[in-house]
Regions:
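Sec-dependent N-terminal signal peptides
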Residues: 4-13
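N-terminal leader/targeting segments and the immediate start of mature chains
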Residues: 16-56, 69, 203, 208-212
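Extracytoplasmic
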Residues: 38-40, 59, 68, 82, ...
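Flexible, surface-exposed loop/linker segments and immediately adjacent secondary-structure boundaries
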Residues: 102-137
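Gly/Pro-enriched, hydrophobic low-complexity segments
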Residues: 123-130, 134-204, 208-210
């Protein structure tokens, strides 16, 4: 569950205050405009957890579809549906459904409308390295938390400057743990099924359903 919250929380933001690098701020504003123009989007990603001291190197695939305050997240074999009022966490392996209220989740749950927007609040922005691959050019922006008590040392946000898309997010913890989110694909304004964000209870008749 913590990993799911990490994936969601990776994308949260509003507006940043402080002495930001002008080039970094300008590039991120361009990305923000593209994100804000979309009514919905679909993201396929790879999540990697690394800690050399602990010998941890784990890769996991996932996807999320967002439409305003609704979302459908598939990650670690768990499906999470939010219909803007309730969050339904479906664990097929345990034949279990956990239902919680968006309102009750409070600050622990990031509003889907804020996904892909985490860099707008709480960070100092610094222009960083340019990574050139065979198929793309990724410009990294370094984000340093303003909160000195943060467990995060810094973030590296990779922007595909040819497609104006977020490509990669690297989080460096003060405990030397690295979490990497590689965005494999972003589709803006995808065609959505009317039931994409609807929890259909009849499909889970044999499941244990818990209301928090």
């Amino acid at each position: 569950m913590k990993k799911i919250l990490f994936i969601i929380s990776l994308f949260m933001f509003l507006t940043i205050k402080g002495q930001n690098d002008i080039k970094a701020e300008k590039l991120l504003n361009k990305i923000s405009e593209k994100i804000d123009d979309a009514k919905s989007y679909q993201i396929e990603f790879t999540y990697t957890l690394e800690n050399k001291l602990e010998g941890i190197n784990q890769d996991l695939e996932g996807s999320v579809i967002i439409n305003e305050d609704n979302y459908l997240l598939n990650f670690m074999g768990i499906k999470q549906i939010c219909d803007s009022k309730n969050i339904y966490t479906i664990i097929d392996e345990n034949e279990e459904v956990i239902i919680s209220s968006v309102e009750d989740e409070g600050d622990q749950t990031i509003k889907p409308s804020q996904l892909l927007k985490f860099y707008r609040k709480g960070y100092l922005l610094i222009w960083d390295k340019l990574e050139i691959n065979s198929n793309d050019r990724i410009q990294f922006i370094k984000l340093i938390p303003i909160d000195s008590n943060s467990e995060i040392s810094h973030l590296l946000l990779g922007i595909d400057i040819d497609k104006n898309n977020i490509s990669k997010l690297i989080e460096i913890g003060k405990n030397k743990t690295r979490t990497i989110l590689n965005v494999k694909k972003i589709i803006y304004n995808p065609e959505l099924n009317n039931n994409s964000f609807v929890f259909e209870k009849d499909n889970y008749k044999n499941y244990y359903i818990e209301n928090l």
